[in-house]
């Protein structure tokens, strides 16, 4: 899985968007790749191989190949960080459904991988929805494009039979 993540970086150079990714998710990937010996030259490039990466790479805090949305919205001030769950709900999105990050290890270690997967998937969607709102705030999306993206997410999730998406959509409809 880790090798696949970095192969995707190598092939497509996608923009990464996270919520506290600089503070948790990416360091976990860094340590795991170090321990397991998983190479990721494009990810670690800071302009040595590709000059475009000198001022926009995945590692530097103020660059945008990796956008830690929590960090940006807090103006890079740790005292101003807000929880994704709270912000998603304040924006009219469902937020987290029962599990939070502090319960992931317990669920995983007791064989409840499906719960962990569902938690991670809903976390990704909450992050995406807040990111879409951020792009609207910045003028990257106009109202029509923003509304279309939110409608696409709603339609896609509504078409799923997975229990966590049914619960998520019920929570969204209740907001």
Q: PLM features: residue spans?
A:
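Glycine-rich, highly charged phosphate/nucleotide-binding loops
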Residues: 1-4
């Amino acid at each position: 899985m880790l090798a696949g993540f970095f192969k995707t970086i190598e092939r497509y150079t996608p923009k990464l968007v996270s919520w506290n990714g600089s503070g948790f998710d990416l360091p976990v990937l860094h340590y795991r790749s170090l321990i397991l010996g998983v190479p990721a030259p494009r990810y670690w490039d800071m302009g040595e191989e590709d000059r475009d990466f000198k001022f926009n790479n995945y590692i530097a805090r103020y660059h945008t190949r990796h956008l830690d949305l929590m960090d940006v919205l807090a103006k890079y001030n740790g005292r101003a960080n807000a929880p994704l769950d709270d912000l998603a709900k304040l924006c009219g999105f469902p937020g987290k459904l029962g599990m939070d990050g502090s319960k992931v290890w317990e669920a995983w270690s007791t064989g409840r991988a499906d719960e962990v997967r569902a938690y991670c998937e809903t976390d990704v969607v909450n992050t995406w929805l807040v990111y879409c709102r951020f792009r609207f705030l910045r003028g990257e999306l106009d109202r029509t494009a923003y509304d279309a993206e939110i409608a696409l997410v709603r339609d896609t999730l509504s078409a799923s039979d997975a229990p966590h998406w049914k619960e998520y959509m019920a929570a969204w409809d209740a907001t």
